[in-house]
């Protein structure tokens, strides 16, 4: 799958100029989310504390080092529609992941396969916001096809996992709950839930511990 490498996912995120889009299209009405429990006491705001480090210790070898050394923030651009610094970072990550430029196209250094994917949108949606994203990806040599389909096709393709990328809304609870399992557990990989297709023993273990703790609290 095109998004199986974390460096590719990070590079594509760097190409998404939220600051420009928010200013030019939405009158700065939106704010960026950097935690699943945004604006609650459970939001991730700092480095893991002592209790969290105890939970994470058995899984440390399976986690990116950044979990312990960096406070997560989404990429921030200059908001001018062309953030050269972010695109250079994205280019570096793609090269490290084995995706190189050949002419104007990003291809796999080993197989020659082009780096391309499809963005699936509901037929009724406004695609204005994704066109600048598509243009930024083109600067990196990545082709993103935008395809609109009706709601029944969206549902069918979700059930069969026949999609590369689509917009999703997570209506998260303001506190940890069993909803975490539905949204992120590998147990729900063959359903319309867990839309990103996350399959991680680490995430499964953490979710199970959270649910067990909720049970003890009640």
Describe the function of each predicted region.
Residues 1-36, 40-216:
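Extracytoplasmic/periplasmic ligand-capture domains
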């Amino acid at each position: 799958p095109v998004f199986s490498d974390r460096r590719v996912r990070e590079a594509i995120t760097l190409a998404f100029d939220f600051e420009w889009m928010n200013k030019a299209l939405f009158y700065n009405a939106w704010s960026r989310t950097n935690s699943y429990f945004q604006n609650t006491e459970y939001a991730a705001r700092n480095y893991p504390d002592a209790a969290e480090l105890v939970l994470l210790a058995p899984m440390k070898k399976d986690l990116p080092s950044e979990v312990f050394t960096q406070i997560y923030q989404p990429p921030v651009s200059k908001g001018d529609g062309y953030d050269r610094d972010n695109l250079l970072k994205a280019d570096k990550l793609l090269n490290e992941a084995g995706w190189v430029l050949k002419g104007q196209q990003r291809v796999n250094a080993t197989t020659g396969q082009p780096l391309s994917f499809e963005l699936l949108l509901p037929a009724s949606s406004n695609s204005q916001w994704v066109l600048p994203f598509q243009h930024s990806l083109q600067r990196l040599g990545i082709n993103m096809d935008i395809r609109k389909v009706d709601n029944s096709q969206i549902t069918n393709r979700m059930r069969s996992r026949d999609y590369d990328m689509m917009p999703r809304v997570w209506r998260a609870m303001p506190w940890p709950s069993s909803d975490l399992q539905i949204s992120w557990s590998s147990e729900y990989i063959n359903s319309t839930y867990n839309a990103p297709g996350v399959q991680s023993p680490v995430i499964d273990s953490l979710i199970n511990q959270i649910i067990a703790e909720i049970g003890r609290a009640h």
